[in-house]
Swiss-Prot record:
Subcellular location: Cytoplasm
Keyword Disulfide bond tagged: no
Disulfide pattern: none
Gene3D superfamilies in the record: 1.10.10.200, 3.30.70.980
Keyword vocabulary terms for this entry: Cytoplasm, DNA-binding, Transcription, Transcription regulation
Keyword field contains Thylakoid: no
GO biological-process terms attached to the record: regulation of DNA-templated transcription
InterPro entries linked: Integrase-like_N, TACO1_YebC-like_2nd/3rd_dom, TACO1_YebC_N, Transcrip_reg_TACO1-like, Transcrip_reg_TACO1-like_dom3, YebC-like
The organism of origin for this protein: Chlorobaculum tepidum (strain ATCC 49652 / DSM 12025 / NBRC 103806 / TLS)
Cellular-component GO terms for this entry: cytosol
Protein's recorded name: Probable transcriptional regulatory protein CT1665
Amino acid sequence: MSGHSKWATIKRKKAATDQKRGSLFTKLVKEITIAAKMGGGDPTGNPRLRLAIDTARANSMPMDNIQRAIKRGTGELEGATYEEITYEGYGPGGIAIIIETATDNRNRTVADIRHLMSRGGGSLGESGSVGWMFKRKGSIEVPRSAISEDDLMELLLDAGLEELESDDEQYFTVLTDVKDLEPVKKALEEAGIPFENAKIDMIPDNYVELDVENARKALKLIDALENSDDVQAVYSNMDMSESVMSVLEEE
């Protein structure tokens, strides 16, 4: 799973430098709206909505925005109707890419995704072409400064911990079954252990290590996809060596 830890590190640094709050809020509003539409507006009985609200609050979204998004999802307020569509394909160096979207215009979205993939050195594939390479998991990052690896493992084993990654210098990455993400969050909260980026993630079974040129192209493509208004999340099985990471960080 070392590739996952490195990719998490890259994404964290990217988010710190180029996150656009307006774009982030748009994606969070869509997720809250869809979650409320699918599972109802009460977060206590809707784990997806509860996670979406927690993520929105962690990113300083005002409660008024959250409540309006919930009401649009439940039909109490008028608003756009979003459809969830997942696209699959390949990127530079042969990496697999999964693109999750939420859109009110399927034709616009597929044209945009196809254009971005083609321009970025990738190509769209058929449904299922790369999805089989990934497993959906719960993922949480816990600062190393907050707890030791042994104590964290002991704390979370009964709550649903599946794997604890410790390759990152600053964070442990906790992986769980999707249904166990909420119990693991609760265990951390009750123990007073801080955590970040609790989310549902797509974890690849294997990784493709890229050289500098392909890694640069892949990051540029993923960045372009993530900046599309209709894209909610992008997953890949890219990996890179420490030396490649160092080169890219200096650019």
